[in-house]
Regions:
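Repeated loop/turn-to-beta-strand initiation elements of outer-membrane beta-barrel proteins
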Residues: 77-82, 133-135, 190-193
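Substrate-binding/catalytic groove segments of enzymes
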Residues: 185-194, 203-209
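Cleavable N-terminal export/targeting peptides
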Residues: 1-30
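Short glycine/proline- and aromatic-enriched beta-strand/turn motifs that initiate or cap beta-hairpins
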Residues: 20-73, 79, 232-243
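Residues on the lipid-exposed face of transmembrane beta-strands in outer-membrane beta-barrel proteins
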Residues: 36-40, 68-72, 84-86, 123-129, ...
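Hydrophobic core residues within well-ordered beta-strands of beta-rich domains
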Residues: 32, 64, 78, 119-121, ...
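Short, structured loop/turn "capping" segments at alpha-beta junctions
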Residues: 133-137, 149-151
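Extracellular/periplasm-exposed beta-strand and loop segments of Gram-negative cell-envelope proteins
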Residues: 43-61, 85-120, 145-174, 202-236
Length: 243
């Protein structure tokens, strides 16, 4: 029985200590934060429109995301914040193969591509709500994006003649807009665990893409234009420094 009493007393003491810590943390008023987080990048539909005269068969697949964000609360609920997000997504080239197979299904076509590299620098207002050790945020932001289109290559045999089409890697920049929601849980006086989801939409225009066509021993280059409406949903988790 002595061991049971000792265990019960120990559990009660631990529970009281945990409750006391939560009470203290919930009454500390933090006005600012700095987040460092990482997670997944999911390509989603963009609210930007494409250009029918400059289509593309290259898409982005699921990838990784990293974000640094900082904010400061100006009033009880409202504040301003900024973020820098970088997303890396492998290129999806299956549509290139599907389109050429419609006219030449026996060519043994294959396609490969590099990685989309998208960086977003955004700023805007945010609203926050506190509930004990929990903090909930919602934000609307705008800013600038830098998009790197990956290099791609399509190759096969066009009526028994070797054919390849290589398109070079290139960069573009454009205005962007988005928003997000987040939740933070205080674990010490200065740190919290953070989980957030952010959407960014932009439209990247590539005016000077170089496409190299090789048929047998013959080779030629062509300048082309592509417009990519880009939508990205980043779901990240990490650590938040509170001040």
């Amino acid at each position: 029985m002595k061991k049971v009493y000792t265990l019960v007393i120990g559990l009660l003491a631990t529970g009281m200590s945990f409750a006391q810590q939560n009470f203290i943390l919930s009454h500390i008023d933090h006005r600012g934060f700095i987040n460092l987080s990482g997670g997944v990048s999911l390509p989603v539909k963009s609210f930007m429109k494409g250009d029918p005269s400059a289509p593309s068969d290259i898409v982005a697949l699921r990838g990784s995301s990293m974000q640094v964000a900082a904010g400061y609360r100006l009033t009880r609920r409202l504040g301003v914040m900024g973020s820098f997000t970088n997303c890396l997504n492998e290129a999806g080239t299956q549509k290139l193969v599907e389109n050429i197979q419609k006219s030449n299904p026996e060519g043994g076509w294959t396609a490969s591509g590099g990685t989309w590299n998208c960086s977003h620098l955004l700023a805007g207002p945010y609203m926050t709500f506190n509930a004990g050790i929990w903090m909930f945020d919602a934000r609307i932001m705008g800013g600038y994006s830098w998009i790197q289109r990956p290099s791609t290559e399509l190759k096969g045999n066009f009526y028994e003649v070797p054919l390849s089409v290589k398109t070079n890697q290139t960069r573009s920049s454009s205005f962007s807009a988005g928003g997000g929601v987040g939740i933070r849980c205080k674990i010490t006086r200065s740190f919290a665990l953070a989980l957030h989801a952010d959407y960014v939409g932009t439209r990247a225009t590539f005016d000077n893409l170089t496409s190299t066509l090789t048929i047998g021993e013959e080779k030629g280059e062509e300048k082309m234009r592509e417009v990519h409406p880009i939508g990205s949903l980043s779901i990240n988790g990490g650590l938040s420094f509170l001040f």
